[in-house]
Amino acid sequence: MATVSNVWQPEFMQGRFFRLFVSHTSAHRQAVGALRAALLPHGVVAFVAHDAIQPTQEWLDVIVRALREAEALAAYLTGDFHDSAWTDQEVGAAVGRELLVLPLKVDQDPYGFIGHYQAMNANIDTGVLARQIAAVLRTHGLTKRPMAEAVVDRFVHSDGWNSARENLNRLKELPADVWAPWLVEAVRLATSSNTEIQTADVGFGQSTVAAEALKLIDSLPGP
């Protein structure tokens, strides 16, 4: 995997994350920041550029670099979205790269390049919205393979019993056709090298996360 900017690496966390650029205006930074936090457990790191009035050249460079490295874009569509000097350009850049664009409708319908896209309702609980976004990224043809890499890597880096259980559940949600041999091997190795995965129980002590993960990958169809 090519080296990417450190803007995509969450603090105190390591490994591979799916890179989602979230285009929004500065008035909605708090809501988008909450969404960013809710996406992290799903293996998604959101870059949340905002509508600075007079951004410095350095800040613009960061935005341009993030747009080049993003694997999908979400447009947080509010009434002031079109008034921004930057948001439409960010969406246009993603469309030009043929990335998946997710319109998140707060109070503005998709328009322009994404006018024909089906919007997701953003006026719901942030955790629910994050789960819905992650579900789309896991299954859409443009994103399901890089998303699988991120989900498997989250499992490999499970740092507690709860995270091991949650990450196991996300493994189970991956489509069968994204399981490249090296992803299968990464899961298999984690079951013997990560003590949290080895010792976390599931089903009221009836099994362990490691055992269930092995059962999952052994049930996958062959190449």
Task: Please report, for each region that a protein language model flagged, where it lies by residue.
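Cross-kingdom TIR/SEFIR domain
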Residues: R36-M147, N194
